[in-house]
A protein has these predicted regions:
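Serine/threonine-rich low-complexity intrinsically disordered regions
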Residues: 7, 147, 178, 208-213
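Active-site gating/metal-coordination segments in enzymes
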Residues: 1-23
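C-terminal cap of metal-dependent C-N hydrolases
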Residues: 118, 175, 184-215
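Residue-level detector of anion-binding/catalytic polar loops
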Residues: 21, 81, 194
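Active-site-adjacent C-terminal substructures of enzyme catalytic domains
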Residues: 11, 15, 26-27, 33-164, ...
């Protein structure tokens, strides 16, 4: 939701009543408005996230920092978690590295062309053309993601190491969902694991301790 829209207080109350995660995105709210809404959500005990940070938001300006800077500030304080489409298209690596923290996690924002060859696809009712792995609508705007999480893992691991890449692509997202038994290897956690080869391609998938065929 966009913090600057009408009835935002009522929306937060409904989210709190029904246990809905409040995710800020596709917004042009200013810095103070964004932080104010986050504070209200925190008072209500809500889990708050930033929807694909940077995308669908105005860029940071040093005199008008806007929602991106507000969400980064709140993430630093531990009040929100932020999603990053770390595919090198929606966000270049430098932007991902700048925003990376213990409260940031990778998402794909995947559409039908994710992991597929270049060509023509659809996003809802919109025609989409994928060229060079980048999906665009006729206007030229980016139309969802085509990367897989394993591809983002490989890129991130090259800069931050395997351990941090594992955490970035698993644990924080599970924590946002309140799933303490996911996103970690620990006694009592669900045995959901993905095995990758040296090229970071999935070669083995285990769900609840059982091997899943990849053929």
């Amino acid at each position: 939701f966009a913090p600057e829209t009408e009835n935002v207080d009522k929306l937060l109350e409904v989210c709190a009543e029904h246990g809905i995660i409040a995710s800020l995105g596709h917004t042009e709210a200013d810095y103070d408005t964004t932080l104010s809404v986050i504070a209200k959500a925190k008072e209500l005990g809500l889990t708050v996230t930033g929807t694909h940070l940077f995308n669908g938001m105005p860029s940071i300006h040093h005199r008008a920092p806007g929602p991106v800077a507000a969400l980064l500030t709140a993430a630093k304080a531990g009040d929100v978690s932020v999603e990053l489409i770390a595919d090198g298209v929606h966000l270049v690596d430098g932007a991902v590295d700048m925003a990376h923290s213990h409260r940031a996690f990778a998402i794909t924002d995947a559409m039908a062309a994710a992991g597929m060859a270049d060509g023509d696809y659809e996003l809802g009712s919109l025609p989409v053309t994928v060229s060079g792995g980048v999906a665009r609508v006729p206007s030229g705007a980016i139309a969802g993601g085509t990367s897989t999480l394993s591809q983002q893992f490989a890129s991130f691991a090259a800069r931050h190491g395997l351990g941090e890449a594992v955490r970035f692509t698993s644990t924080p997202a599970a924590d946002v969902l309140g799933e303490a038994n996911l996103g970690r290897i620990a006694v009592g956690a669900r045995a959901n694991l993905v095995g990758l080869n040296s090229h970071y391609q999935p070669v083995r998938v285990i769900v609840d301790g059982a091997d899943i065929s990849l053929s």
